[in-house]
Amino acid sequence: MLVSVFAILNKAHGMATSKTCNENLRDSMHIVLLGDSNTWLGGDDCTSKRGWNTWFAQSFPHATCVSYARSGATWTNTRRTTRNLTENVGRISDNNVIYNQVCRLIAACRNKQQAIPQLIIVAAGTNDAWFENKRPQAFSIQNATQLKAMPNHSLPDLPHTFPLSLAASVQYDCLLLKKHFPQTRIILFTPLQTTAVSENKIAQTGNIIEQVGHTLNLDVVRQDKICCVKRAEELKHFTNTYDGTHTNEQGAQKNGIILANTVAKLLKGGS
């Protein structure tokens, strides 16, 4: 599997990277992952086998692969969200949001603790769907058309008012990434299927993320459609998860390989 992914990437063209995407890619590509618990499971260094990112890192050519993911994270902000670079509570909270992972990444790069990434992957959305009571305005904007009708959010590093819907939060965070990492390829992963919420709710969440991503010319990977975790199967008996939501080692390995090949094709220029 590694050989096939590497072969695909060797043929890639036009990718935002400090070197041509060739046989030296393994030594030059720095990858950063943002996300929630299914990415957090792999550890910051992407070595724990219950996380998809560990198997992704084993299957995908890179120089470094670092995760800033936190368990319980959402895209969606709240009225009490503030910039916080240290909180790590392992559950949903006002400051456990992708925005703060973006801020941690920016700070790490400024402090020379993190190499400027050539690829950023953001895999989130499960908790936005699961804990809607904690994010009551998450689905107040249903699509990119409604988002365009809303006032544009400016992009200071410390906004006075955070966007409160899922759509606007995705837009804001991605624009912030694009501002600070203009040469970096950004790919969004929608949430996996889960027994915690209906397939329709996960699809709705994925649709919003996908539409916003496409308005920003970002690639979007629909994990709910291509990955191995299927709600119907997990409701019968846990197969690729240990609780219906979080991957076991088998599920993480399957997903990591699927995602490595999918990303490789995207970087090559395929769909």
Task: Annotate each predicted stretch with a short phrase.
Residues 1-7:
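Hydrophobic membrane-insertion alpha-helices, especially the h-region
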Residues 28-32, 38-149, 155, 159, ...:
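Conserved SGNH/GDSL esterase-like catalytic core that processes O-acyl groups on lipids
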Residues 98, 163-170, 206, 252:
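Aromatic/hydrophobic pocket-lining residues that form the small-molecule binding cavity
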